[in-house]
Amino acid sequence: MGKEKSHINVVVIGHVDSGKSTTTGHLIYKCGGIDKRTIEKFEKEAAELGKGSFKYAWVLDKLKSERERGITIDIALWKFETPKYMVTVIDAPGHRDFIKNMITGTSQADCAILIIAAGTGEFEAGISKDGQTREHALLAYTLGVKQLIVAINKMDTTKWSEARYQEIIKETSGFIKKVGYNPKHVPFVPISGFNGDNMIEVSSNCPWYKGWEKETKAKATGKTLLEAIDAIDPPSRPTDKPLRLPLQDVYKIGGIGTVPVGRVETGTIKGGMVVTFAPAGVTTEVKSVEMHHEQLSEGLPGDNVGFNVKNVSVKEIRRGNVAGDSKNDPPKGCDSFNAQVIVLNHPGQVGAGYAPVLDCHTAHIACKFSELVEKIDRRTGKSVEAAPKFIKSGDAAIVKMVPSKPMCVEAFTDYPPLGRFAVRDMRQTVAVGVIKSVAKSDKQGAGKVTKAAVKAGKK
């Protein structure tokens, strides 16, 4: 078997019709975790429905509809392998809560794959001022996804025109540069997700294409999308920090009890550890930790784990709570926090008293802009105006925020995934923010400490 491959997470972004599902479906189908039985079942259904040509998007549609009906699909289905990595697709967009998932989920992405449609008019629509592509790319960058791959899709619809490809690359380079990415660090790959050109094998349709190159830690070159994914710089995982694990769900499982589920962001979690949930203020012992239905000796950053806890009911902890080690900088709720907020698209002006919903890690809570401390220059971070009355689209400011109910957040410099958020209002992301400092509440004293925690503490 050899050593297990390292795991990386990618998020696929781009305009609604760019072919994200087809491209992602293709990778999962060809290199992936979908077992032959499932594929045969899907193919049979596709044939019965007259979708006999069986396109990859169908795989994804099946997975997606099952996910939206609340059937949890084995997450292994969203995986595929490259020579070096086991890749998990964090979200296949088109999923209803994509932007929200970007915020709660991009913190998990090591790389974003931007799919751009090459068709006449399609490309232009995708990166126009109000195109989703711009918003997705900006979000990915602001939320710390520092690596990017650009796939120029649907090249077959342009008859594999080199001129069109060059035009798109030029535009896209300018576009991603404005967002913050350095085009020299980004591989550009012309593909057809539908026909499979340059996805896994080199296409014979574009003899003019000499391959992609990028210069990050080392120079890398290649031809296909799969090779570009394989050339992602290995992410550093913050194992040495104290544990922070935002809960995605809490299940009650017969015969086992209460099982919180979430992704380890920093630190490690193992059986026997005494954890504190904030802002709930509940402290208890972790009995065991598992991932993909297998018991783990410890959960590491990047792992999506379930762990069972003693003497805690499902009512006491919920999505948005954060678990941490009770003996090593345990998480706490906060009274307020200061953040650098960038207003992306708000139709009016934002002043003190504005109270939109914040999505920070898995928490979804209304927070009041209680004070606009100063307006700053987005590029330099220098103050340009103290205590502004209002801020509007395009502005950046330091804002004091007060959550409407207890929430657990951290400074971005201490725990990045818990220190960035999106501001949602009017069904769109109106702003994104990075937390500078947190006023933690010390109401923990009155919290609940279970018998199991006390017992474990004596060991």
Swiss-Prot record:
Family that this chain belongs to: Belongs to the TRAFAC class translation factor GTPase superfamily. Classic translation factor GTPase family. EF-Tu/EF-1A subfamily.
Positions of region (G1): 14-21
Annotated region (G2), positions in chain: 70-74
Alphabetical keyword list: Cytoplasm, Elongation factor, GTP-binding, Methylation, Nucleotide-binding, Protein biosynthesis
tr-type G domain span: 5-239
Stretches for region G4: 153-156
Protein name: Elongation factor 1-alpha
Gene Ontology terms for molecular function: GTP binding; GTPase activity; translation elongation factor activity
Source species, domain of life: Eukaryota
Species lineage: Eukaryota, Fungi, Dikarya, Ascomycota, Pezizomycotina
Region (G5): 192-194
Pfam families: GTP-eEF1A_C (PF22594), GTP_EFTU (PF00009), GTP_EFTU_D2 (PF03144)
